[in-house]
Amino acid sequence: MHDLIQGWTHFQSGKVRDLYRDADGEILLVASDRISAYDWIMPTSIPDKGAILTKLSLFWFEKLSGITPHHVISSEVPATVKGRAIICKPLTIFPVECVVRGYLAGSGWAEYQTNSQVCGVPLPGGLLDGSKLAEPIFTPATKAAIGYHDENISLDR
C-alpha cells in the first residue's frame, strides 16, 4: 500500500499523502496519485497527480516564504519518491481544511439548502446546485479521518 523507502519508516497515511519518519525525527511527506472526493478514496488514480500536488505546494511555500514560515526543509528526497515528496519539520497539525468556493456544490450546497449560508457566509436565495457565486468565499472544514466526512465550520467558531 505504501512505498518502502530506505532510511524512512512509514507511520501514517491520509487520503492522498503518506508520512514517513527518519531517525532524526524529520518527516517525509509523499503525495500519492490517489483521488479523494467527498472524503472517500476512489479506486482509480491519476498518473503524476502526486508530482503535480508537490509542485503546487512548493510553489506556494516559496511564494509565501517572505510572509509566513513553513514546515518544508528540503525537496531533495530519495530517488523512489523524487518529485512527489518533501522533507518537513514535525509540527502539530491544526485539523482544518481551507476551502475556497467559486461554485455552490457538495457540502456547501447541502448546508445552503438548510440555512441559505455556507460556513456562516450568507448567500442570496434562489441559488441552485452548481450555481456560480458572485465572488469566491472561504469555507473552512474540519479535517476528518479516512472514512469520515469533513464538516464545514463557521468562521465564528
Residue ranges and their predicted role:
Residues 1-146:
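Active-site loop/lid in soluble adenylation, ligation, and acyl-transfer enzymes
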Residues 151-157:
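Acyl/amide activation-and-transfer machinery of modular secondary-metabolite enzymes
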